[in-house]
A protein has these predicted regions:
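Bacterial N-terminal signal peptides that target proteins for export
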Residues: 1-9
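Hydrophobic helical h-region of N-terminal Sec-dependent signal peptides
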Residues: 8-18
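Sec/Tat signal peptide C-region and signal peptidase I cleavage site
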Residues: 19-24
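Beta-barrel outer-membrane channel/assembly domains of diderm bacteria
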Residues: 25-189, 230-232, 358, 392-405, ...
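Transmembrane beta-strands of outer-membrane beta-barrel proteins
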Residues: 91-99, 153-157, 198-202, 239-245, ...
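Gram-negative outer-membrane beta-barrel proteins
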Residues: 98-106, 144, 160-164, 186-188, ...
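Surface-exposed coil loops of outer-membrane beta-barrel proteins
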Residues: 103-126, 164-179, 187-293, 473-478
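Detector for outer-membrane/organellar transmembrane beta-barrel domains
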Residues: 230, 235-239, 256, 261-442, ...
Length: 496
């Protein structure tokens, strides 16, 4: 179109020029026409070449844009895959706070503060913690072309009671978990089609706890290997594992490196869980318990758990609830921390009951009750007996989107007859704790929404007889005796 316009303009100019006297005056019309035509053809050639170069440049520009669009799409796809299936994850838990008693000194606290705490009897944790504790979980997941995946996990943890900012000399920083697992393996079929294989040092995936008491119902952990999610029937999955734990040396007998091994089958059928464990610790029977003449430790044991995990609050309200009963014999009589107690006797027996849950009572009120109880005998010394029961209730009143008032009440009864084990005395009595904690949150949408920032006041009291259980526990120490104790403080707690 541009070239046509140029030709028309040139013809007009030529027509006007040929009618002028100057044109007529000069001779050789034909020669002049030939010269003019040559110049026109040359101009057309230059215009055609210029247009071709412009078209080529436009084509290259279009190709460059298309290449850029494709490259951007591919880059976004790779970035999405990297952030997902090939992603790196960071998860954690932490709590930290200040606990001050009514005299202005550092307060005494902790879920295992009572004499029953020496055998696992926890009490409510709200307004009762004086430590800084953190867990950092680093995970890397890879997904392959055939759909199989691999995951690596590292967990670091540390806990201190000092309020100082530099705590290296008091630190207990350690590696609590380091393991790898693989799943969705292409060559696996039948019951193992969706199985997950693992090996390393870890907490068992199916452990569960009562958060309000900071107490696991069952805690299986150590170093070993296993397989999860073997499909034995339509609604029946089973886990199989072997864990090892180190009992250390028995210097009196010259034995070293005594280890406990835990062989586990953990079954899930619908909402039901049935766990069976066998324990063995070769040569552990040469261990003689302090204060128990002739009380040789066990070298084997058994443990079982039956639990129901409900997706409602005991069938009467939305929420959740769990109930579990546990039994253990010999090395299995440590019902919570499987394989963690090397001093249990061959005849040790223990039974534990756990019932807990959480629900909304009304649009602005939430409640979380819990019951935990245990009885054991012939535990460390022939004829000893330990009985305790804890009732705990946490209540939350939502004031606004960011503020709630939290209340917690704990009552624990204990009857302990240690028969002189570690110099401990027989005692019985009860313990009571009441806590009021105004709490600030980014969103007050549930009990388990974190982080929480709390200020609190806690009152505790207990039977005076409990002051005499042991010389090295909290109760009975200076400024911490029966008759009522106040603690005040501030705390943060978070997980993600």
């Amino acid at each position: 179109m541009t070239m046509c316009k140029n030709k028309l303009a040139l013809a007009v100019v030529l027509g006007l020029g040929m009618n002028s006297p100057l044109w007529a005056a000069e001779g050789g019309i034909e020669a002049r026409l030939a010269a003019l035509e040559a110049r026109v053809l040359a101009a057309e050639a230059r215009a055609t070449a210029a247009e071709a170069r412009a078209d080529e440049a436009q084509s290259k520009a279009n190709e460059a844009r298309e290449t850029a669009v494709v490259a951007k799409a591919q880059s976004e796809k790779v970035d999405k895959q990297t952030a997902g299936a090939q992603g790196f994850e960071f998860h954690g838990y932490a709590r930290s706070g200040l606990l001050v008693n009514g005299n202005g000194n550092g307060g005494r606290g902790g879920p295992y503060i009572t004499p029953a705490g020496s055998v696992g009897g926890a009490v409510g944790r709200l307004g009762n913690e004086d430590d800084t504790y953190m867990e950092a979980n680093l995970l890397k997941t890879q997904t392959f072309a055939d759909g199989s995946w691999a995951r690596y996990k590292l967990m670091l943890a540390d806990g201190v009671e000092t309020s100082n900012d530099w705590t290296a000399s008091d630190s207990s920083l350690n590696t609590r978990q380091v393991f790898a697992e693989i799943g969705n393996l292409a060559s696996f079929d039948g019951p193992f089609k969706n199985a997950v294989l693992w090996a390393g040092k870890r907490f068992d995936r199916d452990n569960f706890d009562i958060h309000w008491l900071d107490s696991d119902v069952v805690f299986l952990a150590g170093t070993g290997g296993g397989v999860y999610d073997v499909q034995l029937a339509d609604s029946w999955k089973a886990n199989f594992s072997l864990y090892g734990r180190d009992y250390g040396d028995i210097s009196a007998s010259g034995l070293s490196d005594i280890e406990s091994y835990i062989l586990t089958m953990n079954n899930r059928v619908g909402n039901w869980q049935w766990m069976v464990n066998g324990l063995s610790a070769k040569d552990n029977e040469t261990r003689i318990n302090d204060g128990g003449a002739g009380s040789e430790a066990a070298n084997k044991g058994a443990h079982t758990l039956l639990a129901y995990h409900a997706d409602s609050f005991f069938g009467i309200n939305p929420g959740f609830s769990k109930a579990a009963v546990l039994y253990g014999h010999g090395l299995g009589a440590e019902l919570k921390g499987l394989g963690s107690d090397s001093e249990l006797l061959p005849d040790a027996d223990a039974v534990r009951l756990a019932v807990f849950g959480a629900t909304d009572l009304a649009p602005r009120w939430r409640i979380a009750p819990a019951l935990l109880a245990e009885q054991s005998k012939d535990r460390y010394v022939k004829g000893d007996e330990y009985r305790w029961v804890t009732l705990n209730g946490r209540l939350a009143q939502v004031l606004s989107q960011n503020v709630e008032l939290v209340y917690e009440a704990t009552w624990q009864y204990m009857d302990l007859a240690p028969k002189g084990y570690k110099g401990r005395q027989a005692v019985s009595g009860d313990f009571t704790k009441l806590t009021f904690a105004p709490t600030f949150k980014a969103q007050t949408v549930g009990f388990f929404e974190r982080p929480e920032l709390r200020v609190f006041a806690t009152w505790m009291d207990w039977s005076s007889e409990l002051d005499h259980y042991a010389s090295n526990d909290a109760m009975g120490q200076s400024n911490f005796t029966a008759g009522g104790e106040w603690n005040f403080g501030v705390q943060m707690e978070t997980w993600f």
